[in-house]
């Protein structure tokens, strides 16, 4: 089914965008729909992608209205995918 393929394709992009929006801080809350919109996803695909990441423990649901946060495992995974924050790059030698 093409939706499942779309979800798999967008998982790393969604996680990295969440990492950037939260600055890797698990206490920061953002809308899954705003993240999806920035990636060109509709609300349904944003929801399904977020649910997939929630199921893996990389993202956690904060409110029933679509507010999510990244977990410490999600931060680790995003970094393994190549995500970094501007200030992290500045301090690397």
Please provide the spans of the model-predicted regions:
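Short, amphipathic alpha-helical interaction segments positioned at domain boundaries
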Residues: 75-93
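A short, conserved structural fragment
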Residues: 54-65
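Short acidic, hydrophobic short linear motifs in intrinsically disordered regions
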Residues: 24-37
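Short amphipathic alpha-helical interaction segments
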Residues: 8-9, 40-55
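Short alpha-helical segments that sit at the start of domains
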Residues: 1-18, 24
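Accessory beta->alpha helical hairpin/"wing" motif in late/C-terminal subdomains of nucleic-acid enzymes
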Residues: 63-80
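Generic structural signal for well-ordered, non-membrane alpha-helices
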Residues: 16, 48-51, 76
């Amino acid at each position: 089914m093409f939706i499942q393929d779309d979800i798999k394709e967008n998982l790393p992009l969604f996680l990295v965008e969440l990492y950037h929006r939260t600055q890797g801080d698990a206490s920061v809350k953002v809308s899954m729909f705003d993240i999806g919109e920035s990636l060109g996803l509709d609300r349904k695909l944003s929801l399904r992608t977020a649910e997939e990441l929630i199921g893996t423990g990389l993202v956690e649901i904060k409110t029933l209205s679509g507010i999510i946060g990244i977990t410490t495992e999600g931060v680790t995974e995003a970094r393994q995918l190549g995500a970094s924050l501007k200030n992290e790059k500045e301090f690397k030698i």
